[in-house]
Design a protein with these regions (language model features):
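Transmembrane-helix boundary/entry motifs in multi-pass membrane transporters
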Residues: 146-147
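C-terminal end-helix/capping segment
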Residues: 93-107, 167-180
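Acidic, glycine/proline-rich low-complexity segments that act as flexible tails and inter-domain linkers
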Residues: 1-65, 170-180
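Strongly charged, low-complexity linkers/loops
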Residues: 113-138, 142
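A contiguous pocket-lining binding segment that forms or flanks enzyme active sites
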Residues: 97-123
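Short alpha-helical scaffolding segments that buttress acidic/His motifs in well-ordered protein cores
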Residues: 38, 42, 52-59, 72-78, ...
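Conserved alpha-helical segments that form or flank metal/cofactor-binding pockets of metalloenzymes
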Residues: 50, 65, 71-72, 77-97, ...
Length: 180
């Protein structure tokens, strides 16, 4: 993948850049190494970064969607959008939420080891393909999730699809690939 936007160099991190992370990243991570390649790239546009991170922090930490299902959805988005950065980072988060290696591989294939995960995978695929959910999928989600949780699912899928587009377009590399 071609890197189109490099992470912002350390000597260009000013108060505006650090302000984009205020309240969203611990102080010790408000630097190029601590923020990682994705955030260090996004912060080339501090206003956009601050606006997006506020929404993203909600999706990751305050959403009504159960964290395990959130990670099932994000991994499916990352796979469908061919976003290696998103995939690698969220495999770690998924494992922390109890998904196994077999679960992760099943998500990649569009299969699941239980009915709830399978409905979430179907929802991600439908949202990605036709930008809506079929009545059948909406109803199936409703058997397990509240209206708020279904709303959070739709916004999670949309936000991570957009983030995958940005990472892929900008050429954001995994931290271990930086400099290769």
């Amino acid at each position: 993948m071609q890197v189109r936007l490099m992470p912002l160099p350390a000597d260009q991190w000013d108060d505006e850049v650090r302000g984009a992370f205020k309240g969203m990243l611990p102080r010790d991570r408000q630097n190029p190494e601590g923020a990682g390649t994705a955030l260090s790239t996004l912060v080339r546009h501090p206003d956009l970064t601050k606006a997006f991170l506020g929404f993203n922090v909600y999706l990751l930490f305050r959403s009504s969607l159960p964290p395990r299902l959130r990670e099932v959805a994000i991994l499916r988005v990352a796979h469908r959008r061919h976003c290696g950065y998103e995939w690698e980072h969220h495999v770690e988060l998924a494992e922390a939420e109890g998904l196994t290696g077999a679960d992760v591989e099943a998500i990649r294939r569009g299969a699941a080891n239980n009915e709830v995960d399978q409905v979430v995978l179907r929802a991600v695929d439908e949202l990605d393909e036709i930008s809506t959910l079929s009545d059948e999928t909406w109803a199936a989600l409703g058997e397990e999730l509240s209206d708020r949780q279904r709303m959070d699912l739709v916004f999670t899928v949309g936000a991570y699809a957009m983030l995958a587009m940005a990472f892929n377009t900008f050429g954001v590399q995994l931290e271990q690939e930086k400099g290769k």
